[in-house]
Amino acid sequence: MNIEIMTHQGVQVAEVTGEAKSLKGTEAVHDLIGEVAFNHRVPRVLASRELVDESLFDLRSGFAGELAQKIANYRMKLAVVGDFNFVESLALKAFIHESNLGNTVRFLKDREKALDWLVQP
């Protein structure tokens, strides 16, 4: 994975890029959060949905909840950008809906809207 620091409306955002499904498992998430939070010291993260292995969207894996908790613990914001129409699980749809009401993690289709949300205080 690559992390590029960009500026949007005067605020730094870490954009994560890489191979599809390169975020596999909680260890990869811990590494990513550590890299962004401690090495780059940027609390706002933009990532493509394609980076996340689809199996991790299974709520039974605990990945989604752990990701949200880690982001909250480190006082970060994460926007995951992409198409979430593949989601069939009512529980996951509810998780995404609830996340999108909060100020920690959002799942958005539009990159510009994601960036605009990330830079809000």
Q: Predicted segment positions?
A:
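Amphipathic, Lys/Arg-enriched alpha-helical "gate/interface" segment within cytosolic domains
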Residues: 2-121
